[in-house]
Design a protein with these regions (language model features):
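Conserved ABC ATPase signature
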Residues: 142-146, 150
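Helix-to-loop junction immediately C-terminal to a conserved catalytic motif
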Residues: 56
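Conserved catalytic motifs of ABC-family nucleotide-binding domains
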Residues: 163
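Catalytic Walker B motif of ABC-type/P-loop ATPase nucleotide-binding domains
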Residues: 167-170
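ABC ATPase NBD Q-loop/coupling interface
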Residues: 16, 65-82
Length: 191
């Protein structure tokens, strides 16, 4: 079986050529296969968030490659948007991803940018909301009025609604109580 995603000798250095130059990730390599759960563990400041921002092209490597289905995601920089639809990323802090006036509109943003409309769009939004435990009566609320755990669910639903092949989660259960963590992880496994 071929890996869906490959990280090959990834290095990321911030502020190259300045007195503030600092390597956040050095010579990292791993493969991700269909259906696989992969956890990346490390201390605060060890480069985990920097690493995952490379997986869908939010950051460009200083050296090394990210391959999606065997193809370097940066081989055609104009197509990086397509990579972001295939590799969905949920940030550690969901408020970085939320900006619409309602939960529904926030979840719908990605699918709309994929060209989905009408019933197809509504189905994507409602199914993603259901998967993460967002009730229909919450869809008309402002995402900014929600608790931290609920904001995290909205951010996750917004990414899941795009139906990415790879789902990358930065601290997915932070802010959730034990029952919420268990429920969310079960729903992600079913995804």
């Amino acid at each position: 079986m071929e890996p869906i995603l490959q990280v090959q000798h990834l290095t990321h250095t911030y502020s190259v050529g300045t007195p503030f130059q600092r390597s956040a990730v050095e010579d990292m390599s791993f493969d991700v296969y269909d259906g696989e759960f992969l956890g990346i563990i490390g201390h605060t400041g060890s480069g985990k968030s920097t690493l995952i921002q490379h997986l869908n092209g939010l950051l460009r490597p200083t050296s090394g490659q990210i391959l999606l289905h065997g193809k370097d995601i940066w081989a055609e920089p104009k197509k990086i948007r397509d990579v972001r639809f295939q590799v969905g990323l949920v940030f550690q802090y969901p408020e970085y991803q939320l900006f619409e006036e309602t939960v529904y509109k926030d979840i719908a943003f990605g699918p709309i940018n994929q060209g989905k409309t009408g019933e197809e769009l509504d189905r994507c939004v409602r199914e993603a909301a259901r998967l993460v435990g967002i009730r229909d009566d919450q869809l008309d609320k402002s995402p900014f009025e929600l608790s931290g755990g609920q904001k995290r669910r909205v951010a996750l639903a917004g990414v899941m609604a795009m139906d990415p092949q790879v789902l990358v989660l930065d601290e997915p259960t932070a802010g959730l109580d034990p029952a919420g963590r268990e429920n969310l992880m079960a729903n992600i496994r079913d995804y």
